[in-house]
Regions:
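Helical segment within the ABC ATPase nucleotide-binding domain
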Residues: 88-100, 112
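ABC ATPase nucleotide-binding domain helical subdomain, centered on the C-loop/LSGGQ "ABC signature"
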Residues: 6-48, 92-93, 101
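ABC-fold ATPase nucleotide-binding domain signature/coupling loops
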Residues: 30-61, 70-72, 154-155
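Conserved H-loop
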Residues: 101-108
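Hydrophobic anchor residue at the start of the ABC signature
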Residues: 63, 91, 107
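C-terminal portion of ABC ATPase nucleotide-binding domains
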Residues: 35-37, 93, 110, 115-156
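Catalytic Walker B motif of ABC-type/P-loop ATPase nucleotide-binding domains
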Residues: 74-78
Length: 156
């Protein structure tokens, strides 16, 4: 529906615009004072002069929703898959460190996020094959270590 960016973050017409702007700033999508006000921004598919967002920007909107609602638990499935490495790093830090009282389950093939987590479960063919912290799994030099090394070397 034709809604402002703030309303798309809150998923409601009864939006706390200041809180939505704070959540969008936290997600890295918006800067107060330098961007069009969030209550004026409308997605292009709904308005001729609206904005057309990239997949990465859409992922930041999803993170802004998580920041806006600050639920007790969040599931993030490939949440940063469309972001460049710098945006991904900032996104992951916000996701995992921005709300310390929030539990987060991260599902990802990109292992840069796993180093920030408390516990990692490696799954192969529907089964958990390894479990531990980032450092513990690297020290074991098992499947997680193999995947980490492959990504660290740039899939060379």
């Amino acid at each position: 529906y034709a809604a402002s960016l703030a309303e798309n973050v809150a998923l409601s017409e009864n939006t706390d615009k200041s809180r939505a702007a704070d959540a969008l700033c936290e997600s890295g999508l918006y800067r107060k004072g330098t961007s069009v006000p969030v209550e004026k921004q409308v997605l292009r598919e709904f308005c001729e002069d609206g904005f057309l967002f990239s997949e990465g920007q859409k992922q930041k909107i999803a993170l802004a929703r998580a920041c806006y609602y600050n639920t007790e638990f969040l599931i993030a499935d490939e949440a940063a898959a469309s972001l460049d490495p710098f945006a991904e790093d900032a996104f992951n830090k916000t996701l995992l460190q921005g709300h310390p009282d929030q539990g987060v389950l991260v599902i990802s093939h990109r292992l840069s996020v796993t180093a920030l987590t408390d516990r990692i479960y490696v799954m192969e063919h529907g089964r958990i094959t390894e479990c531990g912290s980032h450092q513990e799994l690297l020290a074991r030099k098992g499947r997680y270590w193999q995947m980490w090394e492959k990504q660290r070397r740039g899939y060379a």
